[in-house]
């Protein structure tokens, strides 16, 4: 068993221990007798969680399935120049930034469930566009891909939180904290499984386009289930364009965005998630450079390393649900600040490490921080943003992040590491 296999086994064991701890038998002493009304509400809560997480699994699978192969299809199957590939990637981020200010507002007005279906349609168009060799169609695909990414990180969460509140599930055992942590864990597991499935499809079909068709299937399945099982919710009901209620809603959104707490969240998410995006793009080159300096010439086991990172992130999401950290919003704020410090220290240390194995461990710490960050940030946003403007605010929060990523990527230059990038989509 080599170094990376041993680390993956240890991280998998740690996650197994967390799983057993979270699902251990408990002897609850109820403070009141359960009534006939309590039991149906618990059933409704469990059904709500399962219905949402099933759809969420499909939509993140659609994202993860195609991510590792986008660059390969552009560069090697379609024989596009490196500069053209870079422009296609940048166009997707620009599209996401341009759609951020209004995508969520439209979701609030026309319905979050409708917006979730729109994500499936947009991402389906992105997958179909990859089958074409026409450069204009490829740009159209990236355009819809940017919109889909904005919708993925805003409307699904907005629908879930609002539906949770409308169903009055706060008193059940299914807490928002649990749902947020499950989302991060599912994203990690789906990433690993999608990587294995995608590789198998490529080998079986002898084409890097096969994962995009599988991704299209996930979008179709998610869209059908949303229409069949989800009910619609809105940012505000019975508001017409130009009406006083509509103006009040716009004012409420503006007040929310200029709220110091929300402004702090915008800055924090831009810095942390922006750094995360850059890390996703550049960790293979960093580890590859360290390996070359160590005198090794064989290729990195990128699949094992990526699986280890996902296990580290799963462990972080499990830590985020520990009992002592879920009850107080101030505790959540303090924990998030502590995570920023740890992640910053890990990034700083990684720039000074020349040993491949030490660098890998520093990267695992960063991924663990990512696993803690997303459930905590989601919990804070659910508390400070009103349901009536949640979709619009959530999508607008992604505007600075997309601008940051586009600007930084326009300034990056190749270093001494491997020249061929290894692209994954997102980490949530």
Residue ranges and their predicted role:
Residues 4-17, 187, 209-228, 421-428:
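Symmetry-related core transmembrane helices of the 12-TM Major Facilitator Superfamily/SLC fold
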Residues 20-30, 199, 206-208, 215-244, ...:
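Helix-loop junctions on the cytosolic side of multi-pass membrane transporters
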Residues 32-46, 230-268, 289:
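Juxtamembrane intracellular "pre-TM" segments in multi-pass secondary transporters
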Residues 51, 55-72, 85-107, 111-114, ...:
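Substrate-agnostic recognition of the 12-TM MFS/MFS-like secondary transporter fold
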Residues 62-83, 281-300, 350:
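Short amphipathic helix-loop junctions that connect adjacent transmembrane helices
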Residues 109-120, 325-340, 419:
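Cytoplasmic membrane-interface "Motif A"-like loop-to-helix N-cap segments
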Residues 121-138, 341-354:
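C-terminal ends and interior cores of transmembrane alpha-helices
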Residues 330-374:
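C-terminal transmembrane helical hairpin of 12-TM major facilitator-type secondary transporters
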